[in-house]
UniProtKB/Swiss-Prot annotation:
It comes from the Bacteria. Keywords: Cell membrane, Membrane, Transmembrane, Transmembrane helix. InterPro entries: UPF0353, UPF0353/GerABKA_families, VWF_A, vWFA_dom_sf. One of its GO terms (cellular component) is plasma membrane. The chain crosses the membrane at residues 21-41, 63-83, 304-324. Residues 94-289 form the VWFA domain. Belongs to the UPF0353 family. This is UPF0353 protein MAP_3434. Signal peptide: none annotated. It is a multi-pass membrane protein.
Length: 330
């Protein structure tokens, strides 16, 4: 739900009152308005007793009382404490970066190559991440390596990203299993309730070790289903273009990006799937993931804006009363 926000005043939410009973004070300005109308009617009748001629009266004389009543309404809303959505950093969440280091990541369709661009974007993601989040890193090709266990010291991940190097094959399923194991170890050490966790998987395509993604032991789909069962969604980022090439044994080999398997991994695990063909798009994908998992949205008190507006309106009413209804000494 959209919330109006005024410069110098702040947001003015009008839903989810924490103290709705205070809205009964809204009857006070209504009663005062009724009393004012009765007094004005009696005043007109009293004037007509002495003269039948119309008495010239400025309609502006009603403005101070109207603004005063408006200020009471605004202050009543402030007392009822409306709520608005607040983004609160997650302090115990665990995020595992899982980055493909296979030979296809040598492709230079993204400068300087897919892996280096992935390192740059992941480093920026780590540096901007909410400080209380535990961040870890798994690098993988044919074999996954837990390079950084989950830790709130994000610099450890930034340093490890600089050391990623190419290797043969792509064992995406094993890499996910490794990340899940690291998350489980953090949950055991962290207390009674497991922290919210997420895997961020970056690759340019599907796994080839094993060749069957549904392999019951190491298949990537098997790993994705386990992640779903453990409540760990996988956000996948498919990175690269259809025109990617690498040089092997003096020959150009096409390594086009493949999105189908990555999308299925995200779907099976309950996560989101992203695609990026350049560094800018990759950074946007990371930013979207950070907004999704780095914070949680909770209702918070939103009466400050109404209080400021009510006080400002009361001051305006006072100024109008002095300006319009002033009496000069004779």
């Amino acid at each position: 739900m959209g919330v109006v926000s005024l410069p110098g005043i702040g947001p003015l939410p009008l839903y989810g009152f924490q103290r709705p009973g205070m809205l009964l004070f809204g009857l006070v300005p209504l009663a005062l308005l009724a009393l004012y109308l009765v007094v004005q009617a009696r005043r007109r009748r009293r004037l007509h007793r002495y003269t039948d001629a119309p008495v010239a009266q400025s309609p502006w004389r009603h403005l101070p009382i109207a603004v005063s009543l408006l200020s009471l309404v605004l202050l009543t809303i402030a007392l009822a404490t409306p709520t608005h959505d607040m983004r609160i950093p997650r302090n115990r969440a665990v995020i595992m970066l899982v980055i493909d280091m296979s030979q296809s990541m040598r492709a230079t369709d993204v400068e300087p190559n897919r892996l280096k661009a992935a390192e740059q974007a992941a480093s920026q993601f780590a540096s901007q991440l909410t400080p209380g989040i535990n961040l870890g890193l798994v690098g993988f090709a044919g074999t996954p390596y837990l390079l950084v266990p989950p830790t709130p010291q994000h610099q450890a991940t930034i340093d490890a990203l600089k050391k990623l190097d190419f290797a043969d094959s792509t064992a995406t399923g094993e890499a996910i299993f490794t990340a899940l194991h690291a998350i489980s170890a953090t949950a055991v050490a962290g207390g009674d309730t497991p922290p919210p966790a997420r895997i961020v998987l970056l690759s340019d395509g599907g796994e080839n070790k094993p060749s069957n993604p549904s392999d019951p032991h190491d298949g990537v789909y098997t790993a994705a289903r386990l992640a779903k069962d453990e409540g760990v969604p996988i956000s996948t980022i498919t990175f690269g273009t259809k025109g990617g090439e690498i040089e092997m044994d003096g020959q150009k080999v096409a390594v086009p990006v493949s999105t189908d398997q990555m999308k299925m991994v995200a779907k099976l695990s309950g996560g989101q799937s992203y695609t990026a063909t350049n560094l800018g798009e990759l950074q946007k994908s990371y930013n979207a993931i950070e907004n999704e998992i780095g914070y949680r949205t909770v209702p918070g008190p939103g009466s400050a804006g109404w209080l400021r507006l009510g006080v400002l309106t009361a001051l305006i009413a006072t100024a109008l009363a002095l300006l319009i209804n002033r009496r000069l000494p004779t």
